[in-house]
Swiss-Prot record:
UniProt keyword annotations, A-Z: Ribonucleoprotein, Ribosomal protein
Entry protein name: Small ribosomal subunit protein eS6
Single GO term (MF): structural constituent of ribosome
Membership in a protein family: Belongs to the eukaryotic ribosomal protein eS6 family.
One GO-annotated biological process of the protein: translation
Entry's Gene Ontology cellular component terms: ribonucleoprotein complex; ribosome
Gene name in the database record: rps6e
PANTHER family reported for this sequence: 40S RIBOSOMAL PROTEIN S6
Species of provenance: Methanobrevibacter smithii (strain ATCC 35061 / DSM 861 / OCM 144 / PS)
Length: 128
Protein backbone atom coordinates (compact mmCIF):
# COMPACT_ATOMS: atom_id res chain seq x y z
CA UNK A 1 0.00 0.00 0.00
CA UNK A 2 1.36 3.42 -0.94
CA UNK A 3 1.68 6.04 1.73
CA UNK A 4 2.79 9.64 2.05
CA UNK A 5 5.93 10.87 3.78
CA UNK A 6 5.75 14.55 4.72
CA UNK A 7 9.23 16.08 5.06
CA UNK A 8 9.47 19.41 6.92
CA UNK A 9 12.53 21.58 6.56
CA UNK A 10 12.51 25.05 8.16
CA UNK A 11 9.88 26.98 6.15
CA UNK A 12 9.23 24.40 3.41
CA UNK A 13 7.30 21.13 3.56
CA UNK A 14 7.43 18.47 0.84
CA UNK A 15 5.16 15.46 0.38
CA UNK A 16 6.58 12.26 -1.12
CA UNK A 17 4.52 9.25 -2.26
CA UNK A 18 6.27 6.00 -1.31
CA UNK A 19 5.06 2.73 -2.86
CA UNK A 20 6.95 0.31 -0.60
CA UNK A 21 6.32 1.27 3.01
CA UNK A 22 7.67 -1.94 4.53
CA UNK A 23 11.08 -0.32 5.11
CA UNK A 24 9.58 2.12 7.63
CA UNK A 25 7.53 -0.49 9.53
CA UNK A 26 8.62 -0.79 13.15
CA UNK A 27 9.98 2.75 13.47
CA UNK A 28 8.78 4.66 16.53
CA UNK A 29 8.11 8.40 16.86
CA UNK A 30 11.49 9.98 17.57
CA UNK A 31 13.53 7.41 15.59
CA UNK A 32 15.91 8.62 12.89
CA UNK A 33 16.32 6.87 9.54
CA UNK A 34 18.21 7.26 6.28
CA UNK A 35 16.38 9.43 3.74
CA UNK A 36 17.52 7.13 0.94
CA UNK A 37 14.58 4.87 1.85
CA UNK A 38 12.18 7.54 0.54
CA UNK A 39 14.41 8.82 -2.26
CA UNK A 40 16.29 11.57 -0.38
CA UNK A 41 19.88 10.35 -0.61
CA UNK A 42 22.24 11.96 1.91
CA UNK A 43 19.44 13.12 4.22
CA UNK A 44 18.70 11.88 7.73
CA UNK A 45 15.04 12.15 8.76
CA UNK A 46 13.33 11.91 12.17
CA UNK A 47 9.79 10.55 12.59
CA UNK A 48 7.57 13.13 14.34
CA UNK A 49 4.12 11.61 13.89
CA UNK A 50 1.60 10.38 11.37
CA UNK A 51 -1.94 9.18 10.75
CA UNK A 52 -3.60 5.86 9.97
CA UNK A 53 -6.01 4.97 7.16
CA UNK A 54 -9.00 6.31 9.13
CA UNK A 55 -7.33 9.62 10.03
CA UNK A 56 -6.46 8.86 13.65
CA UNK A 57 -3.20 10.55 14.68
CA UNK A 58 -0.20 8.78 16.17
CA UNK A 59 0.50 9.70 19.80
CA UNK A 60 4.00 9.43 21.24
CA UNK A 61 3.03 8.10 24.68
CA UNK A 62 0.86 5.22 23.38
CA UNK A 63 3.17 2.21 22.85
CA UNK A 64 2.78 -0.19 19.94
CA UNK A 65 0.61 -0.13 16.85
CA UNK A 66 -2.76 -0.37 18.56
CA UNK A 67 -5.61 2.11 18.49
CA UNK A 68 -7.04 3.17 21.88
CA UNK A 69 -9.66 5.53 23.27
CA UNK A 70 -7.72 7.83 25.57
CA UNK A 71 -8.99 10.54 27.93
CA UNK A 72 -7.37 13.72 26.59
CA UNK A 73 -7.30 17.23 28.01
CA UNK A 74 -5.40 18.71 25.06
CA UNK A 75 -2.44 18.13 22.82
CA UNK A 76 -2.27 15.73 19.90
CA UNK A 77 -5.69 14.49 18.85
CA UNK A 78 -7.82 16.98 20.82
CA UNK A 79 -7.87 20.76 21.25
CA UNK A 80 -10.53 21.85 23.80
CA UNK A 81 -12.22 25.23 23.47
CA UNK A 82 -11.93 26.00 27.20
CA UNK A 83 -9.57 25.03 30.02
CA UNK A 84 -10.23 21.90 32.07
CA UNK A 85 -12.33 20.13 29.45
CA UNK A 86 -11.47 16.45 28.91
CA UNK A 87 -12.77 14.13 26.26
CA UNK A 88 -12.25 10.54 25.26
CA UNK A 89 -10.73 10.42 21.76
CA UNK A 90 -9.29 7.63 19.63
CA UNK A 91 -5.55 7.81 18.94
CA UNK A 92 -3.04 5.47 17.29
CA UNK A 93 0.11 4.05 18.90
CA UNK A 94 3.60 5.42 18.29
CA UNK A 95 4.89 2.62 16.00
CA UNK A 96 4.60 2.65 12.21
CA UNK A 97 2.65 -0.35 10.86
CA UNK A 98 0.77 -1.34 7.69
CA UNK A 99 -2.27 0.75 8.69
CA UNK A 100 -0.31 4.02 8.68
CA UNK A 101 -0.84 6.05 5.48
CA UNK A 102 0.96 9.29 6.41
CA UNK A 103 4.30 9.68 8.17
CA UNK A 104 5.45 13.12 9.30
CA UNK A 105 9.19 13.70 9.41
CA UNK A 106 11.67 16.50 9.97
CA UNK A 107 15.15 16.86 8.47
CA UNK A 108 17.93 16.17 11.00
CA UNK A 109 20.87 16.46 8.62
CA UNK A 110 20.68 17.72 5.06
CA UNK A 111 22.29 16.18 2.01
CA UNK A 112 24.35 17.90 -0.67
CA UNK A 113 21.33 18.64 -2.92
CA UNK A 114 18.18 20.55 -1.97
CA UNK A 115 14.99 18.49 -1.57
CA UNK A 116 13.27 20.58 -4.26
CA UNK A 117 16.05 19.67 -6.71
CA UNK A 118 15.84 15.95 -5.89
CA UNK A 119 12.05 15.86 -6.25
CA UNK A 120 11.97 18.22 -9.25
CA UNK A 121 9.62 20.63 -7.48
CA UNK A 122 9.59 24.24 -8.63
CA UNK A 123 10.60 23.47 -12.22
CA UNK A 124 7.08 24.25 -13.50
CA UNK A 125 7.19 27.76 -12.02
CA UNK A 126 10.51 28.52 -13.69
CA UNK A 127 9.28 27.33 -17.10
CA UNK A 128 6.19 29.59 -17.10
Amino acid sequence: MAFKVVVSQKEVTHQIEVEDGKALNGLVIGDEFDGGIVGLDGYTLKVTGGADKNGFTMKKDVPGTRRIKSLLSGGIGYHPKSDGVKRRKTVRGNTIADDIVQVNTVVVSAGSKAIADILGVGDEEEEE
